[in-house]
Regions:
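Inter-motif core of Ras-like GTPase G domains
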Residues: 92-115
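Conserved C-terminal guanine-recognition region of P-loop GTPase G domains, centered on the G4
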Residues: 116-144
Length: 245
């Protein structure tokens, strides 16, 4: 297990997949950042909006600045590197060039969703990381966007096979982010999950006092969002525990 105690969680995590649209930003902004409050977030991105669209401050980097990023990371206790799909290949080339640089990263999180093409890309991402001599136990899969009743081992047989057959990565049923509309709704509000959880406003009380229809609707929405955010947060706690143990 990483980290000395609950308050100081020292770990450096890279998030990547050759496929886009796997919810990388949800993972950087909502899963990792709130549980690693001191972490600096690096976004290695040439085209995507990245984590800054989710109410989280990021440092933007193009793939070529790899060397200076690795130097900076060596000085930090914890960091999150959010690598855009179109930059993964460059990022891996750089890791190869800067031999041993992957040792500065404790965990490679590879998020995936059910689509067949994405699953194939996920297998390729894991194999490419292994080809760089990154140890399988540092490569952790996060299954994203599964309904509550869906089982990851049934939905992702090829990835479970990769873990058991090739021993190429670590999979765990607990590392599953369940579908929750709170993530989409947060995106449209430009807020992070933590903002909702820490919002002290009693919206049910406000609803009773509201006179305008629009304000009433806003209060009802906020009550629902806060309820969803509690469920999402418990789910993410479980996922974080699974990928960092």
């Amino acid at each position: 297990s990483f980290g000395k105690n609950k308050e100081r969680f020292d770990v450096k995590i890279a998030v990547m997949n050759f496929s886009g649209n796997v919810g990388k930003t949800t993972i950087a902004a909502h899963l990792l950042k709130p549980r690693m409050p001191n972490a600096r977030i690096y976004s290695v991105e040439s085209i995507n909006a990245g984590a800054d669209a989710s109410g989280v401050e990021v440092e933007k980097l193009r793939g070529k600045k790899f060397g200076s990023m690795i130097d900076a990371i060596m000085m930090l206790d914890d960091a999150v590197i959010d690598v855009g799909a179109s930059n993964v290949e460059d990022f891996m080339k750089m890791m190869q060039q800067y031999d041993g640089s992957h040792e500065e990263i404790d965990i490679f999180v590879v998020p995936t969703v059910k689509e067949k093409k994405v699953q194939a890309d996920t297998v390729n991402t894991v194999r490419a990381l292994r080809a760089l001599n990154i140890s399988a136990k540092k490569i952790r899969i996060v299954f994203n966007k599964l309904d509550v009743e869906e089982s990851p081992s049934e939905e992702f047989p090829s990835i479970y096979g990769l873990a058991s057959g090739e021993k190429a990565c670590i999979v765990s049923d607990a590392a599953t982010i369940r579908m929750n509309e709170v993530f989409e709704r947060l995106k449209s509000h430009g807020k992070a999950l933590g903002d909702l959880l820490e919002d002290p406003t009693d919206y049910r009380q406000k609803l009773r006092e509201a006179t305008e229809q629009a304000e009433k609707e806003h209060c009802v929405q906020m009550v629902a969002l806060k309820r969803l955010s509690v469920t999402a947060n418990e789910n993410l706690d479980q996922v974080f525990k699974a990928i960092t143990k």
